[in-house]
Every structure is written in structure tokens, then in C-alpha cells.
Amino acid sequence: MKLLSKLARLAQKLVDNGLGGGLAQEMNKPVGERYVTPGMGEAVRAAASEGIVLLENDGVLPLARGARVAVFGRCQFDYFYVGYGSGGDVHPPYTVSPAAAFAAAEKEGRLTCNAALRKVYEEWRARSANRSDDGWWGHWPMHYPEMPVSPALAAEAAAESDVAVVIIGRAAGEDRDNKPEPGSYYLTRTERDLLDAVTAAFAKTVVVLDCGNIIDLAWVKGCKGRISALVYAWHGGMESGNALLSVLTGEISPCGKLTDTIAEQYTDYPAARHFGGKKYNEYAEDIYVGYRYFETFAPERVLYPFGYGLSYTNFSFEAGELVEEEAALCLRFAVQNTGERAGKEVAQLYVSAPRGRLGKPARVLAGFVKTDVLAPGQRREFELRVPLYSIASFDEAAGEYVLEAGEYAFYIGSSVRAQVCAGRWHVGRERSFGRLAHICPVQKPFTRLCMGEGGAPAQQTVSVRRVDLRARIEGAMPVAVGFRGERGITLQDVAAGRAGEDDFISQLSDADLEALTRGYGCMNAPFGSHGNGGAFGGITPALQARGVPPVITADGPSGLRVSAFTALLPCGTALASAWNPALVQALYEKAAEEMVHFGVDVLLAPGMNIHRDPLCGRNFEYYSEDPLLSGKIAAAAVRGIQSCGGAACIKHFACNNQETNRNKNDSRVSERALREIYLKGFEICIAESAPAALMTAYNKINGVWCHYNYDLAATVLRGEWGYTGLIMTDWWMQHGQSPEFAGVKDNAYRIRARVDLYMPGSFSRMCKGYKADKKLIGRVDRRGGVTRGELEYCARNTLRAVIRLCFAGNKAEQAEPKSAFRRV
């Protein structure tokens, strides 16, 4: 395996050297000082700590001061701090492993660690055959082979220690879906033997899961009475060890909550039979994703429900009043700490809507609030405002969101199984929120889950719908300003208000406009930080001469992915598990400071696709199976990222729920599921944070690639949601031919779909810089090409992004450009 890995790395290096960028960032090495943004370590630790979820505890936690602890599992040293790929390839200035954190706690006199056991692990890891191998792109290890622990070794450790802590790790990532096999979704035989040996020798065993996604926990039932505590620590970034110890020792009371349902078996998940397809996946579960399915049709198949998480204290909930406003409901309630320790709680509000003719999930998250630390006995009152539109259902036949007649019951509590009724609201007759255009029509019929008689599960055929997309596009063609010749206007003049956008655009040739709709061509563009994700805007001498600076991009959700030492943040699932938007915003405000330091204008984050199935490799980047929680946490991240003048780029729009064959895979989904589940989080995020940019997904939706999808970009984003930011592709899109317009293909097809910017800019990974698309330029306003108006439309959106990002005080009399030409 090690020889194969070395050969693969060599091949990767040779390929990347020839690709002039390509995936060369994977090979980047950090250079420069080990810079740490002031306050970043504390922010990472706080976020990672609050995201830790306590699933089981018989009283062993928090560990008593001076407790004698034996730590098992190689992940105490070889911790998975983050998942793989563009969302995790960060070079942190430091990392704190659990082993290091336990050692520090011992030095401070808080714990006594089993030194003999630690030495056994260190000697085993030092052997060449047992050293961790990090693999290569798309072939990273999902686990590290565990050290066998014999009953005798466990007994020796138990003779010196009172409590065992077993750490088990898993990882997946971009181009690397989890697999339903041992070493990935399931435990290995060695790990099972480890648990058997340790639980047989110790009366108290704490199991810690270092994972970015849900794994099989059916074994927990078989260990009932033998496992004292179960902790989901996730990938906590560079402060993982410190965050874990702060919870285990009671420095903070655990307050994380699950963002996904943990089922009895993998096959219990409704998408399991329709995940992993090489050509397509039918979203047969429809709107019944995650808890929407389990709480409606299979509550008995749940090990740990959505929103669940224990604390070291207890809380009670008290309903207040429900008040109807013009377009919302206002619900008041109280939370009280009824235990003996201080702690935080997440108050979760769920709505149970009338079944009606459309069928509804038993419960849907309608709102939530994270309390501050409540002292024992302390009581706090809260108010949640629920927009009526947010609890409406989409009627596919009518093409509108509706509130069906009947009673809407609201429940407040600490999980989806909340018991306290917070109020009931009655709708006398059905209410509509207005007709919408049908989008992304199904092209091949398939069978979906629906609600039958008496609320029982039933099947229904999703029929093909015909939409005249050509007429829709032709009826909304942008009007061109036209080329009027040189006027000596710079972009700085526009930014300062001395000239208008149209005045500037009228000077630009078709070639200039085309350059504004594409990136430089490769990753690691020769502007800004080394190892950047690419550049757009002022990428040609002609545009730079007109005062258009280049805009620098970088991944990603877990920190800046450049050739420098940058902070490694907790993974998306960990952040969402905190259920604390203010905390997430504060963390990304620190990331925004780091963007300024390293000259990055656009952070390609957050990733916010739905956790449709636990095997998706990039679930660690994303937040939840629920769109409301996903949208709220993403909005907090965006507000933080944009706090210092930079841009967030939310992604991947939409239905990018699988890594296997992601560039070719077709997500076949009903319009109701698309709108209620897979677009809803983006809608919430855009409404609450106005992200400056959005990235399309690699996959198709009902036969149309997202980067060529007019309905996603124009009908929904621009038309329905009023989005004014920049729409860009993911890196390297697929060749495509418009079925509606003969001869319109590739970049012309994308521009006609109103996707503003192609990144990194070239179809060829051999590209080492910008090269004009002469075919597109030569066909402007001609058969088989786009109109000048369409080209201006996309270029205008790019220019607006450049002004926003590269000019200080863009309406000031003297707008000053930021330095975007320097290398850091």
C-alpha cells in the first residue's frame, strides 16, 4: 500500500506539473510563518466544544478531578481533524491531538493518564508498518488500522486506571464517498475486539467518535451496560483535543445536538436504496428526508433522534403564548435549568401541520434558539417568530406554496420528539403565497414515497412535465447597452460614482466582456496568495488598463486553502451541531480577518448541501439533513466571512449529494422535494445574509447540468429570490449543448443560462493562463451564439462583484483600489 501510495503521488505530481494548476493545490506545501490570527484559537476551540454531542452518559462524565484515565485508540495521536479535499486541505499552524490535550491536563493536575499504555501505543506507531499513510486525492484513508489490544493488555491498564477512553476515527471527503463496509461506515473487527477487551476489563468506558459524518452505531445496543458514555466529537479542527478535554472534564457542559437522525441500520435510511448510482439517483424518498421520514413512518427505527444531545444538567420548557401577526406567528416560551450544573440548552420549535391533500411530515423544524449559560435554577424567556411562508407546503399541481386548512400544532423541547405544546393555530381555508413558474421539470418518470390513507406510506409516480424553456428564455432576453467606443472611463470612476455602469460597459469590446465571464484559466493564478483557487475580473491587460483588478478566490469551509499556514476550523457538521449562529458568525469573523491578511477576496464557503444520505463523502463540509438549520448556520457563516469586506460563496447549488461520479450524475427529483428540501436552505441563507457569490454544483438536476440550468440561475435565484450576487460555476464544468438553441454550447450555453462566471476559466487542465474563447466572441449576435445583451448581463454581475470587493468606499469621491496584484 505504501509503495502504491508513493507511486500515485509521483504520478499526481507529474500530471499536475503538466496541468498548469489543475489539482496542483493538493501538492502545495505551506510556506512562511506559522501565522495565527489573534483570538482564532479561542474561537475554534469554543465552536468545536459547543458542537460536541453527548449521546450516552451513566454519570461517568464529567471526569472527576484526579481521575485515573487510560486512553485507547491510535486516533488519540492520529486524529482526523477534518475531512478530505478542497473543504479540508488546510495547513494549520498547529494542531492539538487528544493525546496532547490529555498530557496537558495531567500536567495541570486535572487527570492522571496511564503512561505505560501510552508508551505501548507510541512504540507500536513508531514501527514503519504501522505509520499512518495519508494516501492521495480521492484515495485517502477512511480509517487508520487500529492497534490490536489483547484482554491481557486491557486488564493491565485497568489495574492502574479507573476509566477507559476509547477514540475511534473516520474520514471521507471530496471524490471519496463513505462505503457501507468495515473501516468506513462500520467498525472493523479489530475495533470491535478493542471495545470487547476494554469493556470487559473496565467498569467505566467512554467512547469518543472522531468522525465528520454519521457512522453505524448499532453496536452500542449490544454494549448496553458496558459503555458508560458515548461522545460524538466530530472533526474539531486544530483545537480538537482541547475542545474534547473541555467537555470530558466538565470545563463546559456538553450542549451540542444532532443535526441528523441516527438510525438502527444503514438500510433504514430512506435514500439508501437510491444512493451511489453511477449515472443517476432517483430521490424516491421525496420530501421525507432524515427525521421527516423517521418521525412520520418509522420512529421505531431510530437510535438517536434529530436534535438529540445530553447535558451535564437538566432543563425544562414552559409554553407561553402564540400570537398571530400579519405574515408570521410569534411564539413565547421559557427555558429553566433544573439541574445542579450550569449549562446551555437548545430550544427547538417544531410544527405538526395538518396532513391535508398534499401529505406532510409528522414534524418539521420551525425555529430554534441557543440559550446563554444558565445557572442552576435560572429561567429565561424567549420569543421565536415563524414566518407563515416558512411552514407552507409546495403544491406541484398548482405551482404554489400553500397553507392547507386545519390545525397547526407547535412543540418546544430539546429534540424532534419535544413534548411541550407551545400553541395551536387554525387555518380556516387554504392560503396561497402566489403562483410560481414550474422549474427543472422531471424528464424521466420515477416512483416516490408519499402519504397514503390514514398516514401510511404509499408510492406515487412522478410524472414528466413539459416546460417551454426556449420561450421562457426568449421572453426575458437582456437588452444590450451596445459598444459605443472609448470614453476613458475606469472602473474606479464607476466605484466613485463619477460614471455609470452602462457608460463603462459601452466601452468594452465583445472580447473584454467575454473575459469578464471567465476566470484566469487555472488554479494558483499569478495574483494574490500562492496556492489560490483562481482569479477573475481583471485577468487581461486590457481590463487591468481600465482599472479592473483581479479578484482572488480560495477554498474553503474549514479555512483558507492556500500555500501558507492558516487556521483549520471545525467541520461543517461540528459547527451546525452547536446550533449557535452567533458562535459560527464569530468564528468566521476571525476567518475574515485571515482573508485580509493573506489577500483573499472570495472564500469558497460555506458548503450547505443537505445530508440526504450518511454515505456522502462531503457531509462533513455540510450541515444537516434539515434545510432550516442548514440555511441559518450558513447565513451566520456568510455574515462572518463578509464582515471585513470580503465575499462568501455559498455552494453547491444544488442537489450535490453524492461524490461518486459527481460530474456526470443526474439527481432526479420532484419539484416539491427540490423546493422544500434542496433549495430551501439556500433561499434562507440568501434572505438572511446576502452572500456576494454562489457556486453551482457539478451534477445534473433532471437531466440538466447545474452550470447550464436557466431555471436555477434565472427563474429561481434572480426571479423569485431577487438574488443580486455573482453566480459562478464549480471548478471545471462539463461540455454541453443546449437542447433548445442549436449551436449554443459550452460557455455560450452557460451564459444563456445566466450563470455569470466560469471557474477557473478553461476546459483544458493544461491551461496556464487566460485564452479568449474566439468561437464565442465570433458568434455574438449571430446564429449559434449569445447576444451582446446576454454577455453584458453576466459581465455586469462580475464587475459589480469586483467593485464590491476591490474598492474601498465604492461610492466615495475617491474610491481606492485594494492591492490585488501582489503575491503573499
Per-region residue spans from a language model:
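Extracellular and select intracellular beta-sandwich modules with Ser/Thr-enriched
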Residues: 419-423
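Short beta-strand edge segments in extracellular beta-sheet folds
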Residues: 424-434
